Amino acid sequence: MAHKKGVGSSRNGRDSNPKYLGVKLFGGQAIEAGNIIIRQRGTQFHAGDGVGLGRDHTLFALVDGTVAFSIKGPKKRRTVNVIPA
């Protein structure tokens, strides 16, 4: 028999940091060039006119203007545009 009590160890107790994904500016809001519109994993929203796509699929404004969302094409893709001011 063991002379010491076996101490169990839990394999839980880890959690990843929050990623703060989602829409940062909504339709009709004013935006400046370089501002982030959406942080996302994959292309849930696609870049339209005046919008750039970052390495991590972040959508950002290329020009100053107003944010506009639309659904285009047969695949019903959600696109984000920036209408120049």
Swiss-Prot record:
GO cellular component labels: cytosolic large ribosomal subunit
Entry keyword Ribosomal protein: yes
Keyword Transcription regulation: no
Pfam families named in the record: Ribosomal_L27 (PF01016)
Keywords: Ribonucleoprotein, Ribosomal protein
Coiled-coil stretches noted in the UniProt entry, renumbered to this chain: none
GO molecular function: structural constituent of ribosome
BP-aspect Gene Ontology terms: translation
Family the UniProt entry places it in: Belongs to the bacterial ribosomal protein bL27 family.
PANTHER family per the UniProt record, alphabetical: LARGE RIBOSOMAL SUBUNIT PROTEIN BL27M (PTHR15893:SF0), RIBOSOMAL PROTEIN L27 (PTHR15893)
Protein name, as recorded: Large ribosomal subunit protein bL27
Organism ancestry: Bacteria, Pseudomonadati, Pseudomonadota, Gammaproteobacteria, Lysobacterales
